[in-house]
Swiss-Prot record:
Residues 139-149 have a biased composition (Acidic residues). Residues 168-517 form the MRG domain. Residues 316-329 have a biased composition (Low complexity). Non-catalytic component of the MSL histone acetyltransferase complex, a multiprotein complex that mediates the majority of histone H4 acetylation at 'Lys-16' (H4K16ac), an epigenetic mark that prevents chromatin compaction. The MSL complex is required for chromosome stability and genome integrity by maintaining homeostatic levels of H4K16ac. The MSL complex is also involved in gene dosage by promoting up-regulation of genes expressed by the X chromosome. X up-regulation is required to compensate for autosomal biallelic expression. Component of the MSL histone acetyltransferase complex at least composed of the KAT8/MOF, MSL1/hampin, MSL2 and MSL3. Interacts (via the MRG domain) with MSL1 and KAT8/MOF. GO terms for molecular function: DNA binding; histone H4K16ac reader activity. Keywords: Chromatin regulator, DNA-binding, Nucleus, Phosphoprotein, Transcription, Transcription regulation. This is MSL complex subunit 3. The modification Phosphoserine is found at S309, S311, S367, S400, S407, S411. Residues 290-440 are annotated as: Required for the histone acetyltransferase activity of the MSL complex.
Length: 521
């Protein structure tokens, strides 16, 4: 387009140049740059002008900018001296304002000053400035001796800038287990080829999955910590990998990870996690008219009495507390079964809350709940929750372990636990990802209350790209990726529970009728 238009370009594509900071609000400095492309653009008055796509050396390509010809200088010795002159001025100006260093870094300036020849004097710069120096500001013409000190002080910030650039350019990889890769392929096939949808709300929603994982993680961490020598407590934390830090620290990191997944999922689902065929379903299930929230008739202080008294099936803790509890074979309920027993459908978020209450009630010997819970557990719960029940030491300082499953081995295993560690485990088992009063009754629930493992797994395909736009230190990123890996292994281990084929139904059955709204929390 350049030659045919008759436009004469001063610079050509691929040429190394110096370019002024394009943002007029930033300090006027010159960057090392390269011209990527040239076009004929237009100025504010509509006149044709040459424009150059500039890549700033050492920066991610997302920072490439279009610049007018008057912002670009040839890479000559004379212009290099101008570059150093402007860099010292910018540093001195920032110092004179008294700003904190962390808030006044000048990207690219430190590297310019770092390569300053020692024999080069300020007066040489003054005499050799080209006419283009007239464009710079008139302020701070006299550079004080402090600027030399400032150069040495600011140079040490260059590694931080370099680290930030490396973070922008690094590739983040999350390894997805083969069984979950196949699930992603099947998911795509069901939605796009067979035109089926995941029935919503899911039997096991994302809140429940994440809370279950924290409990699973805490129990495994406690077991592994109990097997280590006691003197591991004296090891310096700074020299320990994330695998070897104390169990309570691991659990805290795990909680932060799942909460971050919840927030990220709620935000990104409508943006990047839905196939086009699912958009209409999303709009319908997130409508405020679609779900009818249940109002609890008693406060948490009276909840024990409420549970011991007759109550509707949906609120009665003696009934199975999750949709997973319905099928006796451990498999998810079929759509036909859901229609036959609509009252049993409820959020596992709510069931987790009730389950914790049942555990607290069971500590009283007068309560009939433990026996009933014991009878119902082994035959009706999916193997994931049976697995947690068998490994879970739910007891307090003043009571003996509750026999959630008829196993003498469990008591023997937990007999060696210290009281402090047992209390930590019990604290995790009663932990909730979100408060009881969230979301408010007058608002539709967020996606993490409605969707399940199928859509959560899709998030891990997008996470590398999302994490690449975030600022993480190498140490924190490594720990986060390790937690993601452990969580994906958890999903893979229980994929039969989390990804039942029966979750995909015809579009007409993909959500419950608005004439009979379902409660999901």
């Amino acid at each position: 387009m350049s030659a045919s238009e008759g436009m004469k370009f001063k610079f050509h594509s691929g040429e190394k140049v110096l370019c002024f900071e394009p943002d007029p609000t930033k300090a006027r400095v010159l960057y090392d740059a390269k011209i990527v492309d040239v076009i004929v653009g237009k100025d504010e008055k509509g006149r044709k002008i040459p424009e150059y796509l500039i890549h700033f050396n050492g920066w991610n390509r997302s920072w490439d900018r279009w610049a007018a010809e008057d912002h670009v200088l040839r890479d000559t010795d004379e212009n290099r001296r101008l570059q150093r002159k402007l860099a010292r001025k910018a540093v001195a100006r920032l110092r004179s304002t008294g700003r904190k260093k962390k808030r006044c870094r000048l990207p690219g300036v430190d590297s310019v000053l770092k390569g300053l020849p020692t024999e080069e004097k300020d007066e040489n710069d003054e005499n050799s400035l080209s006419s283009s120096s007239d464009c710079s500001e008139n302020k701070d013409e006299e550079i004080s001796e402090e600027s030399d000190i400032e150069e040495k002080t600011e140079v040490k910030e260059e590694p931080e800038l370099q680290t930030r650039r490396e973070m922008e350019e690094r590739t983040i990889t999350i390894e997805i287990p083969e069984v979950l890769k196949k699930q992603l392929e099947d998911d795509c096939y069901y939605i796009n080829r067979r035109k089926r949808l995941v029935k919503l709300p899911c039997q096991t929603n994302i809140i429940t999955i994440l809370e279950s994982y924290v409990k699973h993680f805490a129990i495994n961490a406690a077991f592994s910590a109990n097997e280590r020598p006691r003197h591991h407590h004296v090891m310096p934390h700074a020299n320990m990998n994330v695998h070897y830090i104390p169990a309570e620290k691991n659990v805290d990191l795990c909680k932060e990870m799942v909460d971050g997944l919840r927030i990220t999922f709620d935000y990104t689902l409508p943006l990047v996690l839905l196939y086009p065929y699912e958009q209409a379903q999303y709009k319908k299930v997130t409508s405020s008219k679609f779900f009818l929230p249940i109002k609890e008739s008693a406060t948490s202080t009276n909840r024990s009495q409420e549970e011991l008294s007759p109550s509707p099936p949906l609120l009665n803790p003696s009934t199975p507390q999750s949709t997973e509890s319905q099928p006796t074979t451990g498999e998810p309920a079929t759509p036909k079964r859901r229609k036959a027993e609509p009252e049993a459908l409820q959020s596992l978020r709510r069931s987790t809350r009730h389950s914790a209450n049942c555990d607290r009630l069971s500590e009283s010997s007068a309560s009939p709940q433990p026996k009933r819970r014991q009878q119902d557990t082994s035959g009706s719960m999916p193997k994931l929750f049976l697995h947690l029940e068998k490994k879970t030491p739910v007891h307090s300082r003043s009571s003996s372990p509750i026999p959630l499953t008829p196993s003498k081995e469990g008591s023997a295993v937990f007999a060696g636990f210290e009281g402090r560690r047992t209390n930590e485990i019990n604290e995790v088992l009663s932990w909730k990802l979100v408060p009881d009063n969230y979301p408010p009754g007058d608002q539709p629930p967020p996606p993490s209350y409605i969707y399940g493992a199928q859509h959560l797994l899709r998030l891990f395909v997008k996470l590398p790209e999302i994490l690449g736009k975030m600022s993480f230190s190498e140490k924190n990123l490594k720990a986060l990726l390790k937690h993601f890996d452990l969580f994906l292994r958890f999903l893979a281990e229980y994929h039969d529970d989390f990804f039942p084929e029966s979750a995909y139904v015809a579009a007409c059955e993909a959500h419950y009728s608005t004439k009979n709204p379902r409660a999901i929390y």
